[in-house]
Amino acid sequence: MKVAIIAGKCDGCGVSTYLFELQKAFNKYAGTCDYYVYDCPSFFKENDYNLMKKLNVKTITRADAAKINNYDIVFAAYHVVRSQVTEDEANGYYDMLEYDITHPLKVLIFNEHRPSSIIKHYANGTINKYCLRLNFLLSFDKIMQFGSNITTAVFLKDLIGEAEYMKRFTPLYHLYEFNNIDNWVPAAAKIKAIEYLGRAALFKDAHRLIRANDKLQKAGYIVEMRGLGYKETLENLPDFVYESDGKYGVDRTKKSPITYWISPNEDQYKLLDLPIEKRNNKIYCYGNYNKYEIYNHLNRVAYACDFFNLPHVEDYADSLMEYCMCEFIDNGIIPILDNNFGSNSNIIVDGKISNTKFNETCAGIFLNKDLSNIDEVIEKMDYLYNNPIEYDKFRKESLEIWKEHCNPKNIIENLLENIYK
């Protein structure tokens, strides 16, 4: 079987990571797979080209799109940031999918979860236009299927009917190959630290670590945050940079007393060994990082957190998650996760959704949004950190849960079964 993946852009976000993992899984378990990115200069930043070259991603234009007709299946990502491209550039990508690629089965990948973005895509009719010409839709199930609460949009299922929609729909499950256990740092050699890795996007809830900082540092934990783009942080979390004015804003003449920002020109890892007593109760904040090198340094920390959560997480597929959750445990770090995610998401066993919730297992340690269980969480963290045998047992059990949940072989088999049913 020959499979092609096409995207409008290539970067380090979860959409691109999913496509990379999909490519690896098809190459390993179901034939051959090539990954193409539409060749439009506006779609990329310079470092994205370096990422593409490293991962052997090919470029394609409308002129040479006919080569894709030699594939059996094409997975096309609805993945264009319109604010960064002209309308003609974006339409060139969509027209290529619609008109130039005619032979293979065409599967649209739509892994969007923000209502505002979904409204935008539906409101102008673009996604319906292309879905009607594609054979299948791969997406988080309930947000597409039952998202009628977004009243301004005309949904695809309303245009083609529920029965036809269900014929075309197949759920999107995150797949990931765990293979790093040989590089795990021994539990007894771990640094008593917790790291946040991610952007300042509101649904990642970086603010939770700010609110938990005082108790964590009093318990002896170094607290650091990485991946916070300065501009996005100023827009979404200004009190990470400036001091709160005591009302609903910040005083831009005063730096935040909580965070300490490290210049991108400095060594991004040399301060990891700085003792907690010299940190003045501050969270050390770093900018963007290289995901392919960061764990060579951070695999020494005991914990990492990702508080990804959505207001209606129960309305999404059980695999709606963040890839850094997998990366934490793949590198031997116990994850601290959002309890709303943990209590509303079921783990996958043998390729099927089970009745077991994430927070009923050792998949991680789960912290409430309001920090109401922070004392219990710190007690659990302390127990594991102070007992290396128990720490090692916990992370190995967690690894097995995540390996089963994201098993690429099972997911690819089920995906092909749904497409060819």
PLM feature spans:
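Conserved donor-binding/catalytic core segment of Leloir-type glycosyltransferases
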Residues: 4, 183-204, 210-217, 224
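A short, glycine/small-residue-rich beta-strand->loop->alpha-helix junction that serves as a flexible
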Residues: 6-20, 203-204, 315-319
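A charged, aromatic-enriched C-terminal amphipathic alpha-helix characteristic of glycosyltransferases
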Residues: 14, 372, 376, 385-420
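Active-site proximal beta-strand in glycosyltransferases
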Residues: 72-79, 89-129, 144
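A short, active-site helix/loop in glycosyltransferases that binds the activated sugar's phosphate group
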Residues: 115-169, 176
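Nucleotide-activated donor-binding/catalytic signature segment of Leloir-type glycosyltransferases, i.e.
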Residues: 235-295, 300-303
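Nucleotide-sugar-dependent
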Residues: 292, 306-326, 337-346
